[in-house]
Amino acid sequence: MQSPVVRQVNVRSSSALLDRYRAVRAETLSLVEPLSPEDLMVQSCSEASPAKWHLAHTSWFFETFVLRDFVAGYQDFHPDFHWLFNSYYNSLGDMPAKSLRSSFSRPPLEDILRYRDYVDAAIARLLESQPDYPANAEAVRRIMMGLEHEQQHQELIATDIKHALFTNPLHPAYRDSSARPSAEGIAPPVEWLTFDAGLTQVGFTPDAANAELFSFDNETPRHTVYLAPFSIATRPVTCAEYLAFMDDGGYARPDLWLSEGWVMVREHGWHSPLYWQQDLATKSGWRIYTLTGWQPMDDLSETPVCHLSFFEADAFARWASRHTSGVRLPTEFEWEYAAGQLGTLLRGAPQRPELLTYPLPGDSVAVAATPANMLETGSLHPTRASARSGLQQIFGDVWEWTSSAYTGYPGYRPLPGALGEYNGKFMSSQMVLRGGSCVTPATHIRASYRNFFTPATRWQFSGLRLARDTA
């Protein structure tokens, strides 16, 4: 399969929006196709949810925030689904505890699939009744938000089922090994792209010609920040490089760790990234569990390391600074600025980060225009950087931890009503990640996109790219 290009979808008609709606909904069903009914019920850690619940909740979102508000006389599919499949919207009423989701053997899967069909038909009727696009701009905006929300849950389905299958003592594969990335070659040496100090704009603001482009409220408002001079690595840290940190006693040296991170190491016995195991059967070193089953370290050593917590990423950066002065994690604004400069480096002209199409085919200047490794590639795991020079893998492969705490931008205002709970109430004790991963849909990511997780989170495809101070 040809690798996808990261791009935003600029929807300009009701029919185009309906086509996009159907495509996104179909992709969700394709993700659960390899799973048995029993697989769909598993919830193996506190962060995860059963795939069956994801199927229902994504339909609940459209029913709750679109159909109930914009379809006169709309009848809910089931009177109990409104509270049963609510996730965390407290202003809409009570909901079951997240830890109980795996106990929902009823409603059965057939009812959940009928629920999806019911909601899909209602959305289609709504859009087909509005040939003059957009007849209701707020309804369109909420449908687009629902699609972005569903794409987030597509990634969660992949990460949740990976954890569930790994927890199973049989360690079954989600899909067969035909989609495994090639083990040939080595990652290119790290180079450093250097940027001068100055003021820059960050955040998302569409222009008049692209008013239909979507962003979450936490990407706004666009505002000015000052960046000190910095350099950023041309690729993420690889498994081999992280293994060197481990071999140097990285998990046994408290001087490398933040206090809370060291507590996690001691209390939870961290000694490697999640899904790494020493291969005792063959005594050949490490092996790594992937969605296509176990793979030897030799096959993945040159791919970006993933399933790291922020604490592990930060400890690695501190260790690396002993060898290269000034090395650290980038701030989220340094990352966004570097990502936004792809257009400048390729074409020699400024380009807005949030409207960036990456890669830009046909260009061959400073940045390697290799396609992004995202959900559509089917690799389901980070792949090796190409041998070409320049900034690589800025989108896809692994979410990249930054040193920035997740908080609101100056002038931030959450959305009105229950949708205001989507992002704003989580702006505490979380860190920002950027760039998307190998299971992020290509039409979902953009340079201004802010993901966020607590610093101990490991079950996501999270890795790191280094930055460093420059004089």
Task: List each model region and its residues.
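Disulfide-stabilized, aromatic/cysteine-rich ligand-recognition loop
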Residues: 1-49, 53-122, 126-132, 136-165, ...
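Functional-site microenvironments in short loops/helix caps that host divalent-cation chemistry
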Residues: 146, 150-152, 156, 160, ...
